[in-house]
Amino acid sequence: MFRRTILLLLFSLSTGFASLKVPATDLVFRDRLWFYGQSDVPFTGVAFSISKETGNIIQQTNYIDGLAWGKYYEWWPDGAKKVNGTYRYGLMFGRWKFFFENGKILCAGSYMSGKGHKPTKGIDEIPQDGISGLWTYWDKEGRKVEEGYYTKNGIEKGNWAFWDIDGKKRLGIKIDHETFKNSIARKH
């Protein structure tokens, strides 16, 4: 019984340290790793940011051995989802979703070794570095407006699908951010 109690106590202490939660402003970036304050040990735990306006948590990042690793969350000051995704080795990896302030989804797609998402006041720019695979975009009302593939190098591949104002699917080639060969398709 005594031995089981000691093991349980040691397990509780070890998991307690592993789940350290600190304000993101207390982390220091040096030598390509994140550290808590003046510690020489790379940070393992959860860092969060709080809205000065509402007091709500607006960002949460998991770290292992000084690298962002695992789930990443970001919320608008009112608590609505803003961004969620996953980090691996400190880089954006796997499926990410970005949301408008009204809670409707803006876009969803995947990353392979993306450099990372920096919190912003708005969703002005979706990080392009490391973008890969199928990406889908919606407008503020929740209507799908664009869908297509990126190569592993982040280059748009093939024809993209666009939805016109009437909701009809059109195929076309994107010329630039605002121009398409299919002129009746609309851009998000």
Where are these regions (language model features)?
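Glycine/tyrosine- and acidic-biased, solvent-exposed loop/turn segments at the edges of beta-strands
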Residues: 16-188
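Short, Lys/Arg-enriched, disordered terminal segments
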Residues: 1-5, 188
